[in-house]
């Protein structure tokens, strides 16, 4: 959530910055609510002052033995008026809150202004795409003989679900283990196991609700009269970041660095017809997530560090990639600045997103009321960051395509072999004669 003081101080400036993100701020609606809030608040303060004055008058009158019934009746009437004003003020503040919950974060000044992904800026590349001396297959054709089973996944759960079997399932698990081990042993993160189902207020904290309810899978429990609605997580960023919800952290404890391997569940409501073949866009996929909770003055250094941590995974796997600075119009709702990592997929002859690392500054912290005690001992909002380290399924796709061989086998990247029992390559099972 944006700082309401920023809106009150520079409403037109904020509206311009949000317009750069493709969001139209209803300046008239906000201004009208603010004017109404100020009027009611002023009226309430006047009533309070009048009641205080009358209370003193009653004390003086009683000291003189005078009749106070008329004055006390007026005080009672003021009390009723104050309750009505406070109720109205609460209603206005709730409407302001609803309006602000729908506003995205403002972009950092270093973010390039643009409309969509066409305006993103490439920051750098790493690695050279492999030159194949045979016809390259995509991950579906490479993986299907090795245990990638889309047919059974669809039979069990419908489109955009996949079954993995045998060595390819083991390779998928090996990738996640390798990522977690790297982040915990080399990058300083604490491994965390989180709930996969969370309460609605948790999603308000990180910004998925109310705007993106259609992208979430919802579950309900209880009978008709006591139904409780919860949500499957679309990323473990949600649960990891909310660990500091409604708390004041000791400044000496920062930075807090957490990582988790979890399934992620997304309805992909706006993705009809996109990436319908293969594992690129699934309703259920695994991801290793990185989250950092830091002091405000260190958050952009932390963002660079986090991007480096995601890059390290790709470099150790020997997968060519590029780093993209997202423009204002392509960033996620909560982000102030985002870098995407895109891995090379030879069958598509292009780079595809495999990680997104974002600094949300105080946007999520304000929604969660997550604070730390600064050097002066005063509570201050933390900054929160999140990043994929990496999407496991898409990394599997990249390994299958970049490490495929002419005979249909797949070479196991060297760093994964300890997790694969020393296996150097995955071969299709021999066909029965």
Swiss-Prot record:
Binding site for ATP: 266-268, 353-356
Positions with a binding annotation for L-serine: 235-237, 289, 388
One GO term of the biological process aspect: seryl-tRNA aminoacylation
KW ATP-binding (keyword) present: yes
GO CC entries: cytoplasm
Molecular function (Gene Ontology), one example: serine-tRNA ligase activity
Pathway where it operates: Aminoacyl-tRNA biosynthesis; selenocysteinyl-tRNA(Sec) biosynthesis; L-seryl-tRNA(Sec) from L-serine and tRNA(Sec): step 1/1
Catalytic activity from the UniProt record: tRNA(Ser) + L-serine + ATP = L-seryl-tRNA(Ser) + AMP + diphosphate + H(+); tRNA(Sec) + L-serine + ATP = L-seryl-tRNA(Sec) + AMP + diphosphate + H(+)
UniProt subunit comment: Homodimer. The tRNA molecule binds across the dimer.
Family: Belongs to the class-II aminoacyl-tRNA synthetase family. Type-1 seryl-tRNA synthetase subfamily.
Protein's name according to its UniProt entry: Serine--tRNA ligase
Record organism: Burkholderia orbicola (strain MC0-3)
């Amino acid at each position: 959530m944006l700082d309401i003081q920023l809106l009150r101080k520079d409403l037109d400036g904020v509206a311009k910055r949000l317009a750069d993100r493709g969001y139209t701020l209803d300046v008239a609606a906000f201004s009208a609510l603010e004017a109404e809030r100020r009027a009611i608040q002023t009226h309430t303060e006047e009533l309070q002052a009048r009641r205080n004055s009358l209370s003193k008058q009653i004390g003086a009158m009683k000291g003189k033995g005078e009749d106070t019934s008329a004055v006390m009746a007026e005080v009672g009437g003021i009390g009723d008026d104050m309750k009505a004003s406070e109720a109205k003020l609460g209603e206005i503040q709730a409407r302001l809150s609803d309006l602000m919950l729908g506003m995205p974060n403002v972009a950092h000044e270093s973010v390039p202004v643009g409309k969509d992904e066409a305006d993103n800026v490439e920051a750098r590349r790493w690695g050279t795409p492999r030159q194949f001396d045979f016809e390259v297959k995509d991950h579906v054709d490479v993986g299907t003989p090795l245990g990638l089973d889309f047919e059974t996944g669809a039979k069990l759960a419908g489109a955009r679900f996949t079954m993995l079997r045998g060595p390819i399932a083991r390779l998928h698990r090996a990738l996640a283990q390798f990522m977690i081990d790297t982040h915990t042993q080399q990058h300083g993160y604490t491994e965390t196991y989180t709930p996969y189902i969370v309460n609605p207020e948790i999603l308000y904290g990180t910004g998925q609700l109310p705007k993106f309810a259609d992208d979430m899978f919802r579950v309900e429990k209880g009978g008709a009269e006591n139904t409780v609605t919860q949500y499957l997580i679309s990323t473990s960023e949600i649960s990891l970041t909310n660990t500091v919800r409604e708390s004041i952290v000791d400044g000496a404890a920062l930075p807090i660095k957490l990582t988790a391997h979890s399934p992620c569940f997304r309805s992909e409501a706006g993705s009809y017809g996109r990436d319908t073949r293969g594992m690129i866009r699934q309703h259920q996929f695994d991801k290793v997530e990185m989250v950092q909770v830091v002091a405000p003055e260190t958050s952009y250094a932390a963002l660079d560090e986090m991007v480096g941590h995601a890059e390290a995974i790709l470099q150790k796997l020997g997968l060519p990639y590029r780093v993209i600075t997202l423009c204002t119009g392509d960033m996620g709702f909560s982000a102030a600045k985002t870098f995407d990592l895109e891995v090379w997929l030879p069958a598509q002859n292009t780079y595809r997103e495999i990680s997104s690392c974002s600094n949300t500054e105080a946007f999520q912290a304000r929604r969660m009321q997550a604070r730390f005690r600064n050097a002066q001992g005063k509570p201050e909002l933390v900054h929160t960051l999140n990043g994929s380290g990496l999407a496991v399924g898409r990394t599997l796709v990249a390994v299958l395509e970049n490490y495929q061989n002419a005979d249909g086998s797949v070479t196991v990247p060297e760093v994964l072999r300890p997790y694969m029992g020393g296996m150097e390559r995955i071969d299709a099972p021999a066909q029965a004669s």
